């Protein structure tokens, strides 16, 4: 990557920033709930079925080092326990400890987990303003990089599916720590203007802000319950559509250029 000092670098998160991964997860989770209900012969009485399942989901994630990337079979087991009448936190705790007696066999649980992954592989929908925003940034000569903690191959596949792969010079896979941004910027020529666009305040905005980037918060549909408040993180900008990004990036670049000539 050969950068120029006056070239803006824009890091962009993938899931729930470029495309709506949350909707795919919701579809997968509701299908999992229905399969567990069918297997044990019980249904939740909760009016909001997705909220019922996601309470269990987040309780499991809080206990696992990979957070929301914990093995889905744990969700199958905890959901069965919750359908037996205990609350989501208690069900997650019991499934995590192990040693429980389940109605679903290991083969049944494995089949539900397999179908969960199959549904999770469905193509996501692109988020509002993404194509317009990326086109404008590309035409302005910005260096565009995807940064993700997910699997690079899956991000590449989804970028092709929604038609945005051609805008990005590189997909960077790794933990979103401040050091990652600093290291990449050293290769791009440490431009005066560097930005991060993301939907997660703790995973996208905070580390980028610590590294000195301008941060653009593009809220998605789902925020885990451990997410800090916007007022605590204080992103530089908050947008409702990705097509707002070019005005922010290019406006800041013009302001910097004017200041350097003063």
What residue ranges belong to the model's regions?
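Asp-based, Mg2+/Mn2+-dependent phosphohydrolase catalytic module
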Residues: 1-10, 107, 131-262
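An amphipathic alpha-helix signature
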Residues: 25-37, 72-80, 152
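Active-site neighborhood of HAD-like aspartate-dependent phosphohydrolases
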Residues: 2-12, 17-52
């Amino acid at each position: 990557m050969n950068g120029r000092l006056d070239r803006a670098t824009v890091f962009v998160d993938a899931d729930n920033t470029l495309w709506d991964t949350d909707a795919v997860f919701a579809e997968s989770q509701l299908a999992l709930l229905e399969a567990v209900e069918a297997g044990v012969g019980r249904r939740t009485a909760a009016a909001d079925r997705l909220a019922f399942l996601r309470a269990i989901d987040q309780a499991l994630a809080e206990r696992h080092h990979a957070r929301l990337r914990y093995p889905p079979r744990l969700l199958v087991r905890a959901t069965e326990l919750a359908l037996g009448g205990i609350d989501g936190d208690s069900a997650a705790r019991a499934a995590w400890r192990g040693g429980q007696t389940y109605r679903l066999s290991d083969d049944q649980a494995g089949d539900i987990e397999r179908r969960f992954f199959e549904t999770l592989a469905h193509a996501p929908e692109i988020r509002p303003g993404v194509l317009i925003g990326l086109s404008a940034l590309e035409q302005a000569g910005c260096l565009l990089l995807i940064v993700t903690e997910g699997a690079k191959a899956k991000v590449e596949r989804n970028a092709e599916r929604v038609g945005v792969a051609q805008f990005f010079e590189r997909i960077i896979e790794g933990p979103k720590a401040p050091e990652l941004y600093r290291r990449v910027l050293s290769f791009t020529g440490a431009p005066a203007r560097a930005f991060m666009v993301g939907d997660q305040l703790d995973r996208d905005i905070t580390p980028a802000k610590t590294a000195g980037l301008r941060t653009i918060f593009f809220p998605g549909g789902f925020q885990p319950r451990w997410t800090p408040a916007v007022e605590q993180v204080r992103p530089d900008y908050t947008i409702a559509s990705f097509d707002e990004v070019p005005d922010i990036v290019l406006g800041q670049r013009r302001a910097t250029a004017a200041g350097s000539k003063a």
